[in-house]
Amino acid sequence: MPRNNDIKKVLVIGSGPIVIGQAAEFDYAGTQACRSLKEEGIEVCLVNSNPATIMTDKQIADQVYIEPLTLESLKEIIIKEKPDSILPTLGGQAGLNLGMELAECGFLDEQGVKLIGTTAETIFKAEDRQAFKDTMEKIGEPIAASQVVKNIEDGIAFTNKIGYPVVLRPAFTLGGSGGGIAHDEQELIDILSNGLRLSRVGEVLVERCIAGWKEIEYEVMRDANGNCITVCNMENIDPVGVHTGDSIVVAPSQTLGDKEYQMLRTSALNIINELQITGGCNVQYALNPDSFEYCVIEVNPRVSRSSALASKATGYPIAKVTAKIALGYHLDEIKNAITQKTYASFEPMLDYCVVKIPRLPFDKFLTAKRTLTTQMKATGEVMSICNNFEGALMKAIRSLEQHVDSLMSYDFTGLTDDELEKQLAVVDDRRIWVIAEALRRGVKYEHIHEITKIDLWFIDKIAILVEMENRLKTEELTVDLLKEAKRIEFPDNVISQLTDIDEADIKKMRYDNGIVAAYKMVDTCAAEFEAETPYYYSVFGSENEAAETNPQKKVLVLGSGPIRIGQGVEFDYCSVHCTWSFAKEGWETIIVNNNPETVSTDFDIADKLYFEPLTAEDVESIVNIEKPDGAVVQFGGQTAIKLTEALMKMGVKILGTKAEDVDAAEDRELFDEILQKTGIPRAAGGTVFTAEEAKKVANEIGYPVLVRPSYVLGGQGMKIAWNDDEIEEFIGIINTITQDHPILVDKYLMGKEIEVDAICDGTDILIPGIMEHIERTGVHSGDSISVYPAHTISEKAKETLVEYTKRLAQALHVVGMINIQFIDMDDNIYVIEVNPRSSRTVPYISKVTGIPIVDLAARIIMGETIKGMGYTPGLAPTADYIAIKMPVFSFEKLRGAEISLGPEMKSTGECLGIDKTFNGALYKAFEGAGVELPKYKQMIMTVKDADKPEAVGVAKRFEKLGYKIYATRSTAKYLQEHGVNALRVNKISQESPNVMDLILGHKIDLVIDTPTQGNGDKTRDGFLIRRNAIETGVYCITAMDTANALAHALETASDKKTPVDIATVKNL
């Protein structure tokens, strides 16, 4: 059936800020779908509050709204734009829930707008726990014994009937939010009360725990005609009980017999037909490893994290096809974009193995619980492809960029046999390393399987890797042994460690004997048809399929790897824009990246895509085959920057700013020389390697000092130290990972923090806009609320900023991007740090100023000038509206993590508020970040002594807004003495009713708690207050500047005269 011609204008709902459970995969899906709709001549409107995405670029849709994803703002956009249809299945859980709410409240019928791609009834049947249960029972699909409960008493009664442990799954939530496994009544009460609060409809499913069964997923497609195909089936290495987003996943499944595979495939198609789903859908199963018994765990009636993985694993563009099906096309009418010969009704075939490993944030949150359950904790993931499972696992491990490159990287040799056995039972992110250690000690496969419930097939494969370690350690390195080690992807540096042979000699031995990587293509059809836009993966001991092309010029663009705190989707945005710019100028583009969730790894972004780890050895193999004319490293974050030196050694030209100038910005002594030459002041400080040296520097310049390693992103390992003991502690933590570069110790200055992104052509600079942070220095720039245009700095300070930016860019010979952070102390400007590369603020500042910085920087790298491109050098004219970028955190998913803000970054995402007034923009930014206020108008204040004078002003503003203020002893006394009617409440250690009772009583909206120094202690009152506030869903602020900003925003909300102004990116 050709497409439905009644559909002319579609509103696509994006997924909002990146949080744990909802990452870059929706930017990828949304971008692909918008492009797919525009191909069909549809007018596309898009709403998304996340400015870091490609989907919010003006060329992706006809109208782009960066507005909070709330019912109110969507209604306004629908009234203004009058779309005939809404596509809600590409915006993750956020998009689905909004589509549902718009349909339920009758607004869509009123406006004559219909949901396409799915119906409200389908969403309800799949997402509502009771409706889903009834539907499965109706078609005879087995589910675990369960009951939907709306209160705690019913939950306890049902659990007593079926016995512990039980799994709790809230309805309509994302990434397992609020869910978990309860082993006893206390755990049940804790998890259930949280789950009922987080569910949109106040429902939680309590079900029999089938942890230990295999977890299998099927990604299926269906059109309106009832044609169905399975795109891919996947198997979690971890058994049921770990969220699939936190599991190691392999595609296609490796341990299913044909009977099991066909049984689950039939079931998946049965379910998708009953639910009448049109488009992509994901079905998760639990399979009893000892029989043919299975249960349906859940169905996602939308594009999901798993569908991004399935798309990249097979080359089948699920989001693109879903968008076409939503327009009425059938599968056999949609061409396969990779082969251009087959159709979307053709099931993909894989002649390789794909492994996905989650990227978990425990390197950022040293106090957080490492255990993995049904509530997701990963911020991102990596994917690798190989022709054998062991090789794919080894490649995925080194793609994580967590200082791991083999199964020896986490060291469990110090454990006794009993301790090791206990560790095997712990489900955390290091489990395969523990299994490897058990195998080294001769523990039997069956015994490991009994404890971990991981299939024997996977244990056997880990044993093959352990056996190879042993052979490399004990045997002579022959050509045959080296061939076999490379076949299962042992990197040269690991072979070198095990054999005690120099890495350079191993490489020479490989080259002399022709042991080099060959590249195979992903073509969806196991090489049955010719592929037009393939992508490649490396294997050893096979024929090379990467086509020899000799165009005029080739550029290698290094991607940014997995999404993690500190290096998010912003850098993918920069990589993609850079690639598009080079392609426009006739260069052949080559991307290397390993993140399945991103736009950069889509099959049609670059001319060639290599799905490989971003390490020197892996990149060198590609360079040897492609021989690029140059490489661009300034857009891939720290990942790409770290490979600069290796690329130069390979003889690859670095395009843009030269490597030695990048080093000069990171190297303390060289940078100090540049500052002296250019006459720019900075904080006093020095470089050290040991705690003794650090204490000496700190005492010379005076406490407090900022301690940080060099060459890091997102303030990794950065701390503010107030005394000698803290220096000892912090240097100890930094030095747990061997440092190749010195540690920096600087005087900590208090002032306004200002950030500038600029481009330089070697002579002139262009600054699109100056951004000012609401939080004072000491809070990482990625965690601060950022305001454009800067609104409290003087003209004189602005002139100084522009002048200093120009001097620094010229002294560092910048060609392309530069990012500088300054401090403004009473019009005296100091430089904090300089990064001659793109930064996380680039997408945001590009959008709000309308200056496409990445494109301009790429053109400069190719030889154009700022004037030649038609721009006036210096600071661009400022806008007549305010744009505020608000950080978004995922603390509630990370039990035990310290939430107070400091110099190490903790936010996972961001959203944007745009308005004519400062307060209006602030209100939208808080709304976009999901801050729901006020409900009860009751708050708790407990602030450190230094903040008390400022707390009085804040408290008075909240009092005026009608808030009842509770405060702990000394804060209450101080507030009362200064005319605030604060109610004193006991500390946690004192008798009830105390602070904890108030928080756990669910009657508090807001906690303002500014921590004292030495915030590492988990038993202190402050830590417990902050943690419990977050875990019961209370908004918690840890800096006075943020509290002031929130008061501003709420004053706007209460003053209803200001209409919400809806602006599109086009008009900015």
UniProtKB/Swiss-Prot annotation:
Residues 402-546 are annotated as: Oligomerization domain. Mn(2+) 1 binds at residues 284, 298. Signal peptide: none annotated. Residues 547-930 are annotated as: Carbamoyl phosphate synthetic domain. Mg(2+) 2 binds at residues 298, 300. The keyword tRNA processing does not apply. Residues 1-401 are annotated as: Carboxyphosphate synthetic domain. One of its GO terms (molecular function) is carbamoyl-phosphate synthase (glutamine-hydrolyzing) activity. Residues 931-1068 are annotated as: Allosteric domain. ATP 2 binds at residues 708, 747, 749, 753, 778-781, 821, 833. Residues 931-1068 form the MGS-like domain. SMART domains: CPSase_L_D3, GARS_A, MGS. It catalyses: hydrogencarbonate + L-glutamine + 2 ATP + H2O = carbamoyl phosphate + L-glutamate + 2 ADP + phosphate + 2 H(+). Pfam families: CPSase_L_D2, CPSase_L_D3, MGS. Mg(2+) 4 binds at residues 833, 835. Mn(2+) 3 binds at residues 821, 833. It is an enzyme of class 6 (ligase). Mn(2+) 2 binds at residues 298, 300. Pathway: Amino-acid biosynthesis; L-arginine biosynthesis; carbamoyl phosphate from bicarbonate: step 1/1; Pyrimidine metabolism; UMP biosynthesis via de novo pathway; (S)-dihydroorotate from bicarbonate: step 1/3. GO terms for cellular component: cytoplasm. GO terms for biological process: 'de novo' UMP biosynthetic process; glutamine metabolic process; L-arginine biosynthetic process. Large subunit of the glutamine-dependent carbamoyl phosphate synthetase (CPSase). CPSase catalyzes the formation of carbamoyl phosphate from the ammonia moiety of glutamine, carbonate, and phosphate donated by ATP, constituting the first step of 2 biosynthetic pathways, one leading to arginine and/or urea and the other to pyrimidine nucleotides. This is Carbamoyl phosphate synthase large chain. The gene is carB.
